[in-house]
């Protein structure tokens, strides 16, 4: 690897290709063995991934005409091509625009139109979508189709853009603050926003995650959250893709995830709380799980309850720890906490109404908890220790801006003499030992008509302790807190009995005792990306109609 490309995120792949060329970078289920029916897995080595992405980078540049800095909308399904295309674009210095199709068609098309990509790399279904909704894709001038059908949609095919005869591609000489990608937020707490990722930000995030988790090159990962897989490859891990719908993790079959874990003898599993719930349910039905190679589980998308930590430990033993890094699309990782710390005491405080402990901030991030306000601010003066405020962060893992959204930047970003701060939109506090506690989204706080504010996450931890409650959500209706319960399928109490029990439980907490109304909702609406964040605005609107 030349020094010229040393800041390029793709240089991490180049390093592993040089150090461990024949090691497996990617694996995914292929055909079944014709004789014994055993599932075969296709693999791609680090050398092959590096060389194939070099070959594609040449073709994208010379045959498709893509240039450094150009925005490229990327609609490629999980598989080898996803990684080849992504790495080729980074090497070229182009800017892949990644929009989660799980956010729904209307939101997806709005995001495409807002970012005006000049090129589209997509599977046939994505190309067809761009033709049907041509106004949203009006900026697209160049196309490459992955998977056949290029003649139908125009442009070139994936195979036609591979130029292996050209040899190594001269990786773009980018600065740490050069744009690498635009990743969209899930849209679960408002309109989806395009988050600028720089090459330095990507590289910093990968290295911090590797250090925090103790990841070593040569370990094996089964990711159920596709964006994380690019980090795993960059850290030198073998990534085995499970046979799941990555856009709908709640539909993931535990057998499919476990099959990938067993085949890979995986050290690491990455998934949303929805995936973990499916695996735990499967394990409890069978009286346990045998995962002797597994060292760690990483969860993203929403806090998980102490009960999930406890249930997983019962199934797999104490040697495997679930870690929950705290952060967001705009800033990750900021802190991390594991099962052992939660089960040693932090979880009990959650159950008593303290909120969710997300661990101590890492050294590379500055965290300030500032007074809660909804409009722009000009300073980040902290509230006293222990007081709830808005979590605000600054560091090399924090995105510098939302793309083409000046009004959102004016609210979310605060420029000071120290540098640019990002307001997370989360509320929380720092305890006496320096740990950060999450108390919910700022926009979900409940302002009471008699005065005062309730932070739902604190109360929900209390109500979630009841054995008949699958999940609880506290929302505001006309200035009153309303408890909404997703009951478990098998309940020991009738619903009227459960209401009385929960109201008695509420009397044990000064904030919770303000709850006087309990409603039932059989299956909570959740965000489309992780299928884990509760859609509180939808529940609040429903509760208002149910009066």
Short names for language-model regions:
Residues 5, 26-79, 83-87, 104-109, ...:
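Conserved AMP-binding/adenylate-forming core of the ANL superfamily
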Residues 43-47, 180-207, 238:
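Conserved AMP-binding A3 loop
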Residues 297, 304, 310-325, 329-428, ...:
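Conserved AMP-binding/adenylate-forming
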Residues 87-90, 95, 203-220, 226-268, ...:
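Conserved AMP-binding/adenylation subdomain of ANL enzymes
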Residues 95-161, 479, 487-491, 500, ...:
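Structural core segment of the AMP-binding/adenylate-forming
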Residues 120-122, 259-262, 269, 395, ...:
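AMP-binding/adenylate-forming catalytic core of the ANL superfamily
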Residues 473-478, 483, 503-547:
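Conserved C-terminal "lid"/linker of ANL adenylate-forming enzymes
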Residues 21-24, 162-187, 191, 214-219:
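Conserved pre-ATP/AMP-binding loop-to-beta segment of ANL
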């Amino acid at each position: 690897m030349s020094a010229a490309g040393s800041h390029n995120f793709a240089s991490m792949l180049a390093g592993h290709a040089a150090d461990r060329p024949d090691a497996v970078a990617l694996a995914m289920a292929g055909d079944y063995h014709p004789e014994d029916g055993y599932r075969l897995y296709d693999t791609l080595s680090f050398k092959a991934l590096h060389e194939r992405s070099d070959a594609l980078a040449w073709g994208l540049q010379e045959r498709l005409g893509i240039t450094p800095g150009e925005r490229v909308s990327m609609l490629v399904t999980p598989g080898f091509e996803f990684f080849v295309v992504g790495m080729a674009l980074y090497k070229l210095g182009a800017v892949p625009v990644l929009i989660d199709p799980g956010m729904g068609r209307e939101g997806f098309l709005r995001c495409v139109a807002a970012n005006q990509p000049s090129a589209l790399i997509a599977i046939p279904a994505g190309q067809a979508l761009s033709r049907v909704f041509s106004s949203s894709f009006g900026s697209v001038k160049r196309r490459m189709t992955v998977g056949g059908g290029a003649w139908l949609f125009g442009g070139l095919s994936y195979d036609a853009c591979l130029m292996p005869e050209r040899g190594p591609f001269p990786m773009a000489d980018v600065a740490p603050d050069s744009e690498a990608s635009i990743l969209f937020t899930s849209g679960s707490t408002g309109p989806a926003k395009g988050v600028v990722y720089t090459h330095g930000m990507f590289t910093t995030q990968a290295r911090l995650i590797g250090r925090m988790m103790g990841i070593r090159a040569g370990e094996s990962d089964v990711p159920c959250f596709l964006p994380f897989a690019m980090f795993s490859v960059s850290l030198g891990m073998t990534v085995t893709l499970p046979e799941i719908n990555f856009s709908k993790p709640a539909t993931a079959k535990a057998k499919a995830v476990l099959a990938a874990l067993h085949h890979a003898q995986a050290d690491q599993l990455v998934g949303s709380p929805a995936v973990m719930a499916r695996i735990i349910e499967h394990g409890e039905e069978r009286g346990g799980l045998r995962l002797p190679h597994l060292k760690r589980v990483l969860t993203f998308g929403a806090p998980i309850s102490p009960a999930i930590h406890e249930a997983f430990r019962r199934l797999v033993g104490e040697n495997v720890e679930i870690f929950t890094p705290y952060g967001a699309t705009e800033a990750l990782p900021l802190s991390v906490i594991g099962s052992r710390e939660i089960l040693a005491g932090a979880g009990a405080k959650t159950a008593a109404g303290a909120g969710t402990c997300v661990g101590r901030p890492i050294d590379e991030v500055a965290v300030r908890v500032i007074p809660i306000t909804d409009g722009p601010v000009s300073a980040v003066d902290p509230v006293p220790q222990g007081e709830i405020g808005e979590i605000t962060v600054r560091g090399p893992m924090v995105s510098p801006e939302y793309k083409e959204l000046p009004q959102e930047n004016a609210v979310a970003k605060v420029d000071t003499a120290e540098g640019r701060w990002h307001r997370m939109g989360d509320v929380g506090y720092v305890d006496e030992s320096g740990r950060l506690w999450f108390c919910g989204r700022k926009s979900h706080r409940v302002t009471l008509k008699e005065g005062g504010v309730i932070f739902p996450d604190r109360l929900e931890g209390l109500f979630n302790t009841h054995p008949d409650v699958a999940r609880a959500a506290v929302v505001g209706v006309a200035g009153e807190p309303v408890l909404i319960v997703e009951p478990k399928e098998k309940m020991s109490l009738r619903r009227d009995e459960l209401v009385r029990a929960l109201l008695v439980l509420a009397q044990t907490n000064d904030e919770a005792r303000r709850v006087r109304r309990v409603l039932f909702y059989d299956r909570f609406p959740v965000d489309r990306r992780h299928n884990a964040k509760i859609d509180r605005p939808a529940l609040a609107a429903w509760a208002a109609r149910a009066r």
